[in-house]
Curated annotation (Swiss-Prot):
Entries under PANTHER family matching the protein: 40S RIBOSOMAL PROTEIN S11 FAMILY MEMBER (PTHR10744), SMALL RIBOSOMAL SUBUNIT PROTEIN US17M (PTHR10744:SF1)
Any GO molecular function: structural constituent of ribosome
Gene that this polypeptide is encoded by: rpsQ
Record organism: Psychrobacter sp. (strain PRwf-1)
Signal sequence bounds: none
One GO CC term, this protein: cytosolic small ribosomal subunit
Protein name, per record: Small ribosomal subunit protein uS17
Function: One of the primary rRNA binding proteins, it binds specifically to the 5'-end of 16S ribosomal RNA.
This protein's UniProt keywords: Ribonucleoprotein, Ribosomal protein, RNA-binding, rRNA-binding
């Protein structure tokens, strides 16, 4: 882990913390994170994969494509960003 990333204290219930994979880091101080989840189909009961792309704030530009990161919901930072990077769970391998 990097010491550059702020440690965020999480308190209370209902705090939105999710883990996902970085699919883009081409913006300055911003990353796009792909969140995948499984939901049950209401009629047929089959497990279906659903995904969401979320833009998050990366203050120190530490993330690379392919990293697995943890992000937390926060106040709106811009028109499309209301999530902040908490830490990098797993770094991507160099190919």
């Amino acid at each position: 882990m990097s010491d550059d990333i702020q440690q965020t204290e999480v308190s209370g219930t209902g705090v939105g913390i999710v883990t996902g994979k970085v699919v883009s880091n081409k913006m300055d101080k911003s990353i796009t994170v792909l969140i995948e989840r499984k939901v049950r189909h209401p009629l047929y009961g089959k497990q279906i994969r659903r995904s969401t792309k979320i833009k998050a704030h990366d203050e120190n530009n530490v993330c690379k494509e392919g990293d697995v990161v943890r992000i937390i919901e926060t106040r709106p930072i811009s028109k499309t960003k209301s999530w902040k990077l908490v830490d990098v769970v797993e770094t991507a391998e160099k190919i």
